[in-house]
């Protein structure tokens, strides 16, 4: 009986961590899309704000993600960092392109 309890507790823990990854992934995607929108509008400060929020969530998702989605999340995190760096230099076009790349990776991680 004890073994069954431990197995069920372990299964619940495994299932709950993937739910947390999905929540962070959804938030990262939302903020990355906002960053792209602000980039198209030409607003580097707002773009940087959303890119930083997306990066925070993508890093949190990466901690609990596994396998191929984790690779996409890590690539998205790298692109988001590039977007932040470029927007801090007021290079909106390059920052927008990096944010768009991050969105592509985040969407691929959901599949």
Label each residue range with its predicted role.
Residues 1-7:
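Bacterial N-terminal signal peptides that target proteins for export
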Residues 2, 13, 17-111:
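Long, charged/polar, soluble alpha-helical segments
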């Amino acid at each position: 009986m004890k073994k069954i309890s431990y197995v069920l507790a372990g299964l619940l823990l495994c299932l709950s961590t993937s739910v947390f990854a999905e929540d962070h992934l959804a938030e990262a995607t939302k903020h990355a899309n906002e960053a792209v929108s602000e980039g198209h509008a030409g607003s580097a400060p707002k773009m940087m704000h959303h890119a930083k929020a997306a990066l925070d969530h993508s890093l949190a998702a990466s901690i609990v993600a596994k396998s191929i989605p984790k690779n996409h999340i890590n690539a998205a995190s790298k692109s988001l960092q590039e977007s932040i760096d470029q927007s801090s230099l007021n290079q909106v076009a390059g920052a927008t392109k990096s944010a768009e790349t991050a969105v592509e990776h985040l969407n691929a991680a959901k599949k």
